[in-house]
Amino acid sequence: MNQLELYIDTFVEYLQIEKNASPYTVKYYRNDLEIFADFLRSEGLSHIANVTYKDVRIFLTSLYEQELSRRSVSRKISTLRSFYRFLEREGYVEGNPFVQLHLPKTSKPVPGFLYQEELDKLFEVNDITTPLGQRDQALLEMLYGTGIRVSECQNLRLQDIDFAIGTIFVRGKGRKERYVPFGSFAEIALETYLQEGRTKLLEKSNSDTEFIFLNSRGGHLTNRGIRTILNKIVERASLTVHVHPHKLRHTFATHLLNEGADLRSVQELLGHESLSSTQIYTHVTKDHLREAYMKSHPRANGNKS
């Protein structure tokens, strides 16, 4: 293992232990760092401490030559800026050549969301007379009804649900914890699943578990398992739009804001540290926008002469 690989491994370990980064974040960081390592080797740069601002500019040019999007380039530069900041703090290098690098601002894409008719189709296709159908319905109700992330939903435990006041305890990103309310539809789906479906699924496993959502063998349902379940639900509903679990979170936020919820409350429900992360959801549906226009503009409904 050469020195750069050792630095990368040390940084990744820091992300996992100190920053509690998700496996997906770690994967993307490592990938970005390995791309930079390949560049250094191709340029004959043997020591990371010798990298200059000029080298960084050449690296940036090489990224654009690959026709990567601005967003992808910005993420890679952000990764390397953090990497060098870590190395500088640990005393491995004396400066951060990426500090001087300024990139054009990238606009955040508007998150996709589902219309009510599309949501209704998803909720109608699960066979709630079967254990798996009851689980799928409860899973769907939790993802849309609370807006929690897939990883947060996967890690829900029995003791995290308080049916008396209709809330769940959520362990969020970066060890941040919060309480999120759920409504009557989610309550009914959860109670049915816990009393019937989950009990039957658990019988297939030799061990007990406190996790709420189980796979077909009675074990803990994985993130990939949740995505597979949702794909099957979408297929049964014959939806033509792509639906990933995070789109249900986008839909949750969009529908709340469209119906008058304030931004700060939605921020708290989503577990966003920064309000700017929540502001990307302030788009509205075309129908909602037209309805507001027709109700509010003085010349929207005038008679034509």
Curated annotation (Swiss-Prot):
Report the residue ranges that make up the Core-binding (CB) domain in this protein: 2-88
* Gene encoding the protein: xerC
How does this protein assemble? Forms a cyclic heterotetrameric complex composed of two molecules of XerC and two molecules of XerD.
> Where in or outside the cell is it found?
Cytoplasm
Task: Give one GO term, molecular function aspect.
Answer: DNA binding
Where in the sequence is the active site? 149, 173, 246, 249, 272, 281 (o-(3'-phospho-dna)-tyrosine intermediate)
The record places domain Tyr recombinase at: 109-294
The entry's keywords: Cell cycle, Cell division, Chromosome partition, Cytoplasm, DNA integration, DNA recombination, DNA-binding
Q: What is this protein called?
A: Tyrosine recombinase XerC
Q: Does the keyword Cytoplasm apply?
A: yes
NCBIfam families in the cross-refs: PRK00283.1 (NF001399), recomb_XerA_Arch (NF040815), recomb_XerC (TIGR02224)
Answer whether the UniProt record assigns the keyword Cytoplasm to this protein: yes
**Function as written in the Swiss-Prot or TrEMBL entry:** Site-specific tyrosine recombinase, which acts by catalyzing the cutting and rejoining of the recombining DNA molecules. The XerC-XerD complex is essential to convert dimers of the bacterial chromosome into monomers to permit their segregation at cell division. It also contributes to the segregational stability of plasmids.
**Which family is this protein grouped under?**
Belongs to the 'phage' integrase family. XerC subfamily.
Q: Which domain of life is it from?
A: Bacteria
Q: What Pfam families does UniProt report for this protein, alphabetically?
A: Phage_int_SAM_1, Phage_integrase
